[in-house]
UniProtKB/Swiss-Prot annotation:
Domain (TRUD) ranges: 160-330
GO cellular component terms listed in the entry, alphabetical order: cytosol
NCBIfam families, A to Z: PRK00984.1-3 (NF002154), tRNA_TruD_broad (TIGR00094)
EC number, UniProt record: 5.4.99.27
Gene field: truD
GO BP term, example: tRNA pseudouridine synthesis
UniProt xrefs under Pfam families: TruD (PF01142)
GO molecular function: RNA binding; tRNA pseudouridine(13) synthase activity
Top-level division of the source organism's lineage: Bacteria
Name recorded for this polypeptide: tRNA pseudouridine synthase D
Keywords: Isomerase, tRNA processing
Organism field: Campylobacter jejuni subsp. jejuni serotype O:2 (strain ATCC 700819 / NCTC 11168)
């Protein structure tokens, strides 16, 4: 697999099979709203202030710069649980040293509001959130397309979704991962944060390609015979039978890495029949590889073979990255929707665990790339 010679953006496979649905989506502050959900309650005491903010059409870093200039707090002294996109309206939490509290009473900005202030013992860190709730408004939706949207949402609610990394990881032209590969090959870059971001884009690209291969396997297992699966994947008759027996869409594989969902340690899938029950109950999920020296290793069999197809040409860089695992299969929570036929608006609300992308879910529903 020669990544740097590819001229087209890789498009992961969808898990649902319907045709594209016509709807208009604009990622603006009225039609795309994100609400961060903290991992824990704030204590009400300590040396840090927690600011609950609403920002519109600003990145998290742009919001921090505005607050820094107004307060005198250095950007590095702010804390946040997650970086949020520029487009849309975002409600999120930031932390800052309490000694700068006095500036808050006079703070005013047209795109940035401070809604609430809490006190806490520690600075917010990346990952200190449970997840995010989303509101999405689609426009120009005909009644026939509204019915298709409802069916797609019911299917996703039942089966879950492929937890791909979103376009935000890969840049305007979808090729950030190529720059990450160049850095791993020795290209120098002074900006440490940008260097880390580009390397993570490389890891994310490989993760998406492997997950897409697993989605393909799941489709094939549903649609093809045991004999055809044996020919395609060079597996035993028993392994083909195991695949065909699995009723859920996303097929688990013996020897792959699983994790307790939505938070928990990794472990190998040794007893497939036992783990299938826990997977269907949404207690565990399959974990894809973010390549690196410390990532939990896959065991054996088809899971390892498929992984090697994607990662074999990049193993020389493994020691240069820490690595980890990421859930490949996620679930919509608190899902609801409503259709206003008169306005031709279709509104969707749901909650996602941290690290999942609402735009990935929306692309799966609509079956088209949002920002081409």
């Amino acid at each position: 697999m020669n990544l740097e010679e590819e001229n087209t953006i890789f498009k992961p496979l969808y898990s649902l099979k319907h045709s594209p649905i016509n709807a208009y989506f604009s990622k603006n502050s009225d039609d795309f709203v994100v609400r961060e959900r903290p991992l824990y309650e704030f204590s009400g005491k300590g040396e840090h202030l927690i600011l609950h903010i609403n920002k519109k059409d600003l990145t998290t870093n742009e919001a921090l710069k505005i607050l820094s200039e107004a307060s005198g707090v250095k950007i590095r002294d702010f804390g946040y649980a997650g970086l949020k996109d520029k487009q849309g309206s975002t409600f999120q939490y930031l932390s800052m040293p309490k000694k700068f509290e006095s500036f808050l009473s006079n703070f005013s900005h047209p795109k940035l509001k401070i809604l609430e202030i809490f006190t806490h013992e520690n600075k917010l860190r990346i990952g200190h959130l449970k997840g995010n709730s989303f509101f999405i408004r689609l426009k120009k939706v005909l009644p026939s397309d509204a019915l298709k949207l409802e069916q797609a949402l019911m299917n996703l609610d039942k089966q879950g979704f492929a937890n791909y990394f979103g376009y935000q990881r890969f840049g305007k032209f979808g090729d950030n991962y190529k720059e990450g590969l160049e850095i791993l090959r020795g290209k120098k870059m002074k900006n440490v944060k940008m260097k880390e971001f580009l390397i993570s884009a490389f890891q994310s690209e490989l993760f998406n390609r492997y997950l897409s291969k697993r989605v393909e396997l799941s489709h094939f297992a549903n649609d093809f015979s045991e004999k055809e699966l044996i020919q395609i994947y060079k597996i035993s008759k028993e392994e083909a039978k195991e695949l065909k027996k699995q009723e859920q869409f996303f097929k688990l594989l013996k020897g792959e890495v699983l994790g307790h969902y939505p938070f928990g340690k990794c472990f190998l899938c040794e007893d497939l029949s036992a783990e299938l029950g826990r997977f269907k109950a949404r207690d565990i999920s399959a974990m894809g590889l973010l390549i690196g020296a410390k990532a939990y290793e896959t065991g054996e069999g088809l899971a390892l073979n498929l992984e090697n197809e994607i990662f074999k040409d990049t193993l020389e860089f493994k020691a240069k990255m820490q690595g980890s695992r990421r859930f490949m299969w996620g679930y919509l929570e608190e899902l609801k929707w409503r259709y206003d036929e008169e306005k031709a608006h279709f509104c969707i609300e749901f909650f996602l665990q941290k690290g999942s992308y609402a735009t990935v879910v929306l692309e799966e529903i609509l079956h088209k790339n949002l920002f081409e």
